[in-house]
């Protein structure tokens, strides 16, 4: 049953995405605000399909970030970008430049002025990151960045990249850490979409003005501690797998 439900979701998700992405293409010629609405609609539709077909719900904890703020989140799944697009107002996502080359997806990212960085050019990438970050903050948008730079499996921690510290120092805004347990239900490069409740928790904001070392230590401690707690609440990978079999 898990296989069938996962297959049904994946087919529905890709079919819906193709229809919406192509159908909303004329928005490229219209004001950017309409592109944001289309992206939010796609995200809500994805979450709805996930709930109805796969039995995967979600819960948001903590205060929802508003306005010009830096959101630094644990990244375990594609779900993370989907939900951030659904619940935040005009988020500016930090993403790798290669994603801009994907037809339609890259066009939407450029139209909505997402922050694309070239990870092969360290110094210039940081300068570009800061310049685009300042532009997003000036527009009153929240910036969403995944400090590890890529998705990590539940229970693992990757090195936090220097870009987050540079943004925090240069932008002069609060940083809201965030933790998830999404990888237990929608794993990176995984086919299965497991039933249960994904939790995204926004943690206590870190005020501007800390030195680099204090900021990074505070950020990593809060995010990793919360991520471990959320994984424990869900029972970890073995418990998720057992519940999936029981519901089959």
Where in this protein do the model-derived segments appear?
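Catalytic core of membrane glycerolipid acyltransferases/transacylases, capturing the structured
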Residues: 21-39, 51-53, 69-122
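Generic beta-sheet signal
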Residues: 68-73, 141-145
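Generic preference for hydrophobic
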Residues: 60, 71, 93-94, 200-202
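Glycine-rich helix-loop-beta junction characteristic of Rossmann-like nucleotide cofactor-binding loops
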Residues: 61-65
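A generic structural signal for well-ordered alpha-helical segments
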Residues: 50-51, 109, 136, 168
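N-terminal membrane-anchoring alpha-helices
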Residues: 1-57
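Non-catalytic C-terminal accessory region of glycerolipid acyltransferases
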Residues: 126-248
């Amino acid at each position: 049953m898990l296989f069938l439900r996962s297959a049904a979701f994946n087919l529905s998700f890709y079919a819906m995405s193709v229809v919406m992405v192509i159908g909303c293409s004329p928005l490229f010629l219209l004001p950017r605000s309409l592109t944001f609405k289309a992206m939010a609609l796609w995200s809500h539709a994805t979450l709805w399909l996930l709930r109805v077909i796969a039995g995967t719900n979600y819960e948001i904890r903590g205060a929802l970030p508003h306005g010009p703020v830096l959101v630094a989140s644990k990244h375990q799944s594609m779900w993370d970008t989907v939900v951030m697009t659904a619940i935040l107002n005009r988020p500016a996502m930090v993403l790798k430049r290669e994603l801009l080359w994907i037809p339609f997806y890259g066009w939407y990212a450029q139209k909505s002025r997402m922050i694309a960085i070239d990870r092969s050019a360290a110094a210039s990438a940081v300068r570009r990151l800061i310049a685009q970050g300042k532009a997003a903050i000036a527009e009153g948008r929240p910036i969403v960045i995944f400090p590890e730079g890529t998705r990590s499996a539940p229970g693992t921690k990757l090195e936090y990249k220097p870009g987050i510290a540079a943004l925090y120092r240069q932008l002069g805004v609060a940083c809201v850490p965030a933790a998830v347990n999404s990888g237990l239900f929608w794993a990176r490069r995984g086919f299965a979409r497991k039933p249960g409740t994904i939790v995204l928790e926004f943690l206590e904001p870190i005020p501007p003005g800390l030195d680099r070392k204090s900021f990074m230590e505070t950020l990593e401690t809060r995010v990793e501690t919360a991520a471990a707690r959320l994984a424990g609440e869900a029972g970890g990978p073995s418990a998720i797998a057992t519940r999936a079999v029981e519901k089959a």
